[in-house]
Amino acid sequence: MAVGKNKRLSKGKKGLKKKVVDPFTRKDWFDIKAPTTFENRNVGKTLINRSTGLKNAADGLKGRVFEVCLADLQGSEDHSYRKIKLRVDEVQGKNLLTNFHGLDFTSDKLRSLVRKWQSLVEANVTVKTSDDYVLRVFAIAFTKRQPNQIKKTTYAQSSKLREVRKKMIEIMQREVSNCTLAQLTSKLIPEVIGREIEKSTQTIFPLQNVHIRKVKLLKQPKFDLGSLLALHGEGSTEEKGKKVSSGFKDVVLESV
């Protein structure tokens, strides 16, 4: 007779359930703080596993990038179509001090701008700020009907589009290279550069819906804790930042 396993025998404690451990008991919550350039500094919260042994929680948090709607940061629905990227540069207690990492438009806003009977002008330029951040800035614009125009279409000639694009690149290089990253952020919120492009190209061809649609951070200088703390205020405990007015003027350019 073949000898096999008796399935009727009890198999010890296999039937007992394992103790369920809540994974959130091993995690800590941290507050994300935006720079004082934005009105609302409390972006939200994020979590990470607690520091254990040689694993430090701060190392896992540094470099994290968060995408936030500009309407939430400014408390105004007028900015709902723009997204700001914030990067964690320093951990202070339970606060994460962030810095500007990029800007982008929502896809629905970009699609709503493109229409028939008009020409689209796009330009991009790689430029370094005065505090050594290398950025790639993308601009978008559309041709507009001239005063007393009867014709339905507003198409521009290729030569005119080249002139407009050249002017756009020139303005973006000038505006970005003469300011710091914090000053550039203050310009991007009220769309100062877009209005400057629209005003300067009137003699070439009238434009409408001129926007800086994207800002990409390519390279950043060596980390400086002092400048980051200055960007967040000395105590970095204020919940409100300073309001950027729509009629913003760059103080640095005036002094130069």
From Swiss-Prot:
PROSITE patterns: RIBOSOMAL_S3AE (PS01191). Pfam families: Ribosomal_S3Ae (PF01015). It is found in: Cytoplasm. Keywords: Acetylation, Cytoplasm, Ribonucleoprotein, Ribosomal protein. The modification N-acetylalanine is found at residue 2. GO terms for molecular function: structural constituent of ribosome. Signal peptide: none annotated. InterPro entries: Ribosomal_eS1, Ribosomal_eS1_CS, Ribosomal_eS1_euk. One of its GO terms (cellular component) is cytosolic small ribosomal subunit. One of its GO terms (biological process) is translation. The keyword Cytoplasm applies. Component of the small ribosomal subunit. Mature ribosomes consist of a small (40S) and a large (60S) subunit. The 40S subunit contains about 33 different proteins and 1 molecule of RNA (18S). The 60S subunit contains about 49 different proteins and 3 molecules of RNA (25S, 5.8S and 5S). Belongs to the eukaryotic ribosomal protein eS1 family. This is Small ribosomal subunit protein eS1. It comes from Candida albicans (strain SC5314 / ATCC MYA-2876). The lineage of its organism: Eukaryota, Fungi, Dikarya, Ascomycota, Saccharomycotina. The gene is RPS1.
